[in-house]
């Protein structure tokens, strides 16, 4: 729902009051013409009352409490408080006083609820009087035209657009007089060259107060007015030859652009395009500004150290240090690699070292401006000369997450209020300043790509890369809803979500998310059993421990060789597990934590990626997909999302759709999860549609393993005891069929596995 500013509310109120006063004046102006009729009617009624004659069949007229005449004009105008036929003088006078008292009380009640104070004498305007005298009323001029808002924003480095909240003829005339005008009939948006910006604002200023113009910030215009920076490829000659020779053409372009921006840049290429190589190349070019600080996730510290020693052989090994619990001495290290947690804990030591070049890997970790880790990073960047931020997903769900990262590159661009008001639809709410929205995203995209951010997708720079396809697999409901208690629990969560508001919704959804993981375990394991038979290497991503433990136990029971990496896996064991999956053909499955392993590892040996659970952010899922779909992948990759209907999956999938639309407008998310092919998991039960559309099912009797067997409440016509025995027999038979499916380990496919 759109909101109005206080100035817009005041303007609309003023216009409404003016129109009301004008209407009132018009009615009062016509009062003399009808005054004679009212007087005649009143006199006749008085004489009739004095004679004591009244017609019992004639209904008594009641005094109206408004100024409006009869639509037909044929009915006589009755004085507001004058005597009516059949009434005597005293009763007429008492009725008039009663009407005045009732109207006065109504006016007081209405005035108390009004958000603004009425003008002086405002309470008197609708009170009934004993006459229609217009001596106190003065005509008010009627305002012509409507008040609208016109928002101006950039759509490219040399053009801007104008979007209006309504139609205004004079404003359209101003648009048509601009030399570089262009009108889009589909979106109904005007666009112009930046050379017409000042002229348009000057002419639109004459239309106040009917047109309120929201202009482009001066800082944005100044940024567009700067001469373009032309990268020079000659700078590549100053980079370590071993590293420069391994850079692909698009990576060389990225290095040149970063150097042209004086080493303060966000490299946000899509996952798997070698951001690490580009960052090290830029750091090597500015090696005179070292010492170098690399902040990354805890699981990728050793990987960074390995890359530095391999790609920059001129850096002595003893000058490269990894900051961990065992190595807390910073000393004279030329290159220090630390996790974000260790950076926060040892802020003072790092500040004393005065690093001149800083690399923040997975920089979206710093999205929260109030987090201690972010404030530490901001202090370090303030004293550093060069800052490079690396992230394939710089914002996970909303534009606000970009602010802190932009501040680390250019702290003078915009402050918090300016940025959130312009690009986050910032406004004051009951709970404070609300900056979780989005606005002017096209302009934000232009600014990011103009100076601050470098982003390329795999489709753009690696058209020869193996294809990636997505599929959503609907799990067998008979394996999800295994008892009546499960169905009641899920139904209860769905009902709570429909009535909950605010933070209560988030809490319920989190519990719903955890419960969904529990009920999906059997169905997920059943699907994995069919997948193992294909003898292809695949990755399984899960989040909750209950899901990971269930899959781990299931694979162990099938005697499948697999690796498991989660948040508790040590970094040295982590790298060994990755090597095992990549190099050993007998290792078929990699069971990974969705949070701990969505970045920083390469598993191109996998052909299939399975998501046993969803995540709140589309960027997290895209990062996880890129563990296999990246440089070095030679086979097509299939990403399968296992969905259970009527669970939290339905809600989260819709949330992912909305978030990816916002991120796509900013130009930092190129994937489309909604284009996934929909399939159904193999099931021995009846058609899957009957579980979700029972009204259209043509089956009269429940089939084997049908979910209806467990929740049927229609009693049969047989005796109660016999009915109970029959139902128990059906349930036991269904459960035995499911158990037989899981315990069927004598398949020929398993005998051929290379274990």
Swiss-Prot record:
Example of a GO biological process term: replication fork processing
Protein name: SWI/SNF-related matrix-associated actin-dependent regulator of chromatin subfamily A-like protein 1
Keyword Methyltransferase found: no
Signal peptide boundaries: none
Subcellular location: Nucleus
Motif DESH box, chain ranges: 361-364
Main subcellular localisation: nucleus
EC number: 3.6.4.-
Source organism of the structure: Drosophila melanogaster
Modified residue annotations for Phosphoserine: 63
UniProt-recorded Gene Ontology molecular function terms: ATP binding; ATP-dependent DNA/DNA annealing activity; four-way junction helicase activity; hydrolase activity
HARP domain ranges (all copies): 139-217
Residues engaged in binding ATP: 269-276
């Amino acid at each position: 729902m759109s909101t109005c500013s206080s100035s817009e509310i005041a303007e609309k109120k003023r216009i409404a009051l003016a129109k009301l006063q004008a209407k009132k004046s018009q009615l009062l102006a016509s009062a003399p013409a009808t005054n004679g009729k009212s007087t005649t009617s009143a006199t006749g009624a008085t004489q009739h009352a004095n004679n004591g004659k009244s017609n019992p069949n004639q209904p008594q007229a009641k005094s109206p409490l408004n100024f409006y005449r009869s639509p037909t004009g044929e009915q006589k105008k009755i004085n507001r408080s004058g005597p009516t036929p059949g009434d005597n003088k005293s009763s007429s006078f008492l009725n008039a006083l009663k009407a005045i008292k009732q109207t006065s009380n109504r006016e007081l009640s209405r005035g108390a609820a009004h958000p603004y104070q009425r003008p002086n004498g405002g309470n008197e305007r609708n009170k009934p009087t004993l006459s229609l005298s217009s001596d106190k009323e003065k005509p008010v001029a009627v305002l012509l035209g409507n008040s609208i808002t016109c928002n101006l924003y950039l759509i490219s480095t040399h053009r801007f657009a104008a979007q209006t909240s309504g139609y205004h003829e004079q404003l359209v005339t101003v648009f048509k007089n601009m030399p570089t005008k262009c009108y889009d009939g589909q979106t109904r948006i005007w666009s112009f060259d930046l050379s017409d910006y000042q002229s348009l604002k000057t002419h639109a200023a004459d239309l106040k107060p009917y047109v309120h113009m929201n202009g482009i910030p001066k800082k944005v215009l100044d940024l567009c007015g700067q001469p373009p920076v032309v990268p020079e490829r000659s700078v590549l000659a100053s980079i370590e030859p071993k590293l420069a020779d391994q850079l692909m053409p698009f990576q060389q372009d990225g290095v040149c652009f970063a150097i042209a921006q004086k080493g303060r840049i966000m490299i946000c290429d899509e996952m798997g395009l070698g951001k690490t190589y580009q960052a090290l190349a830029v750091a090597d070019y500015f090696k005179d500004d070292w010492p170098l600080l690399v902040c990354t996730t805890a699981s990728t510290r050793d990987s960074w150290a390995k890359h530095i020693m391999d790609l920059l052989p001129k850096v002595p090994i003893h000058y490269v240090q990894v900051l961990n619990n065992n190595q807390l001495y910073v000393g004279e290290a030329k290159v220090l690699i630390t996790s974000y947690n260790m950076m926060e804990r040892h802020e003072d030591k790092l500040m004393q070292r005065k690093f001149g070049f800083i690399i923040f890997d997975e920089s979206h970790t710093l999205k929260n401006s109030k987090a201690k880790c972010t404030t530490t990073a901001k202090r370090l960047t303030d004293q550093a000369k060069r800052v490079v931020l690396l992230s394939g997903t710089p914002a996970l769900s909303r534009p606000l997450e970009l602010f802190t990262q932009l501040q680390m590159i250019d702290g003078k661009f915009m402050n918090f209020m300016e940025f959130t008001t312009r690009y986050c639809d910032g406004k004051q709410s009951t709970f404070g300043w609300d900056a979780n929205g989005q606005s002017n995203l096209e302009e934000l995209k232009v600014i990011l790509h103009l100076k601050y951010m470098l982003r390329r997708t795999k489709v753009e720079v690696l058209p020869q890369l193996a294809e990636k396809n997505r599929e959503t697999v609907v799990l067998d409901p008979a394996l999800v809803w295994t008892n009546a208690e499960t169905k009641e629990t899920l139904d209860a969560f769905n009902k709570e979500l429909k009535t909950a508001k605010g933070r209560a919704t988030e809490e319920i959804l989190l519990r719903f998310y955890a419960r969904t993981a529990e009920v999906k375990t059997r169905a997920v394991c059943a699907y994995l059993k069919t997948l193992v038979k294909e003898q292809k290497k695949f990755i399984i991503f899960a989040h909750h421990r209950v899901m990971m433990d269930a899959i781990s136990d299931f694979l162990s029971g099938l005697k499948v060789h697999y690796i498991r990496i989660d948040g508790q896996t040590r970094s040295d064991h982590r790298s060994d597990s990755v090597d095992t999956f990549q190099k050993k053909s007998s290792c078929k499955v990699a069971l990974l934590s969705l949070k701990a392993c969505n970045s920083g590892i390469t598993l191109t040996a996998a052909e299939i990626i399975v998501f046993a659970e969803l995540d709140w952010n589309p960027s997290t899922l895209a990062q996880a997909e890129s563990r296999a779909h990246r440089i070095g992948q030679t086979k097509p990759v299939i990403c399968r999302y296992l969905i259970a209907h009527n669970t939290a999956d339905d809600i989260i999938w819709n949330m992912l759709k909305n978030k990816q639309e916002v991120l796509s407008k900013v130009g930092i998310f190129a994937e489309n999860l909604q284009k996934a092919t929909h399939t159904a998991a193999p099931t021995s039960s009846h058609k899957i549609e009957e579980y979700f559309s029972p009204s259209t099912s043509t089956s009269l009797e429940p089939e084997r393993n049908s979910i209806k067997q467990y929740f049927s409440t229609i009693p049969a016509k047989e005796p109660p005891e016999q009915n109970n025995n029959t139902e128990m027999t059906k349930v036991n038979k269904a459960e035995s069929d499911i158990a037989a499916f899981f315990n069927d380990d004598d398949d020929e496919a398993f005998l051929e596995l290379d274990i």
